[in-house]
């Protein structure tokens, strides 16, 4: 999986440990690691930088507001990214499926179980939630680092797999307990929203709320009303745009905090995402800005007074 070249390992180690680089240095480092000179910067697939940028922005950013747009870029790199994810995630995916599904199954049991079984279902829900959170903390961080190293050495551009990582956003579900403890508004303020984008902010809020209700099932499911609220939030929060933004939020929020103290690769991963986002956001702004004629409004001269 890892390159045998000492120079490549040395360069990769320097980039990962040097977390104080400017955005320009980060972008240059990313292109160098991908085997592309800063002058050429021609992405894989035969596309020019401009064509690839437009394609990337239309397939990653636009579906956040309109999930119905086809992901052509994702389809082109499906085989390679899927093979990477299979290899990098094989060590913990099999158990995480169990830890993810069991709490959801036990959520429905209070509706059909007799009162004498309610304490048992709550205990099992709490147990599976704790196991799931433990699996994520000690499994997903290593998977991301392994995935990043694989992409960097193989010369794969990071934005090509962001969509695939978003599809695996269920891995981040139980980490929301920390987000909720820090406050719901902190989550929403990470994404400045325009007036037209308020439904997206509502989806993010619903997703975080339903996750908090899911994790704290033994505490909150004391009445049928709370059970119904939880199921409604759980259903509303799983729209594609909420899942994608939610995964992006968690990755940006926690790659630079406690987990980064254990694995500096997380912060490198966060810096890569920020660098690409800055690069393509600036490009789109320059592309869409049009010079509009400035209308000079001259006030009429006052009439001479006699």
UniProtKB/Swiss-Prot annotation:
GO CC terms, sorted: host cell cytoplasm; host cell plasma membrane; membrane
Protein's membrane topology: Multi-pass membrane protein
Transmembrane portions of the chain: 92-112, 120-140, 161-181
Keyword Transmembrane assigned: yes
Keywords tagged on the record: Host cell membrane, Host cytoplasm, Host membrane, Membrane, Transmembrane, Transmembrane helix
Chief location of this protein within or outside the cell: host cell
Coiled coil, from the record: none
Compartments (UniProt record): Host cytoplasm; Host cell membrane
Assembly description: Interacts with host RACK1.
The protein's name in its UniProt record: ORF-B protein
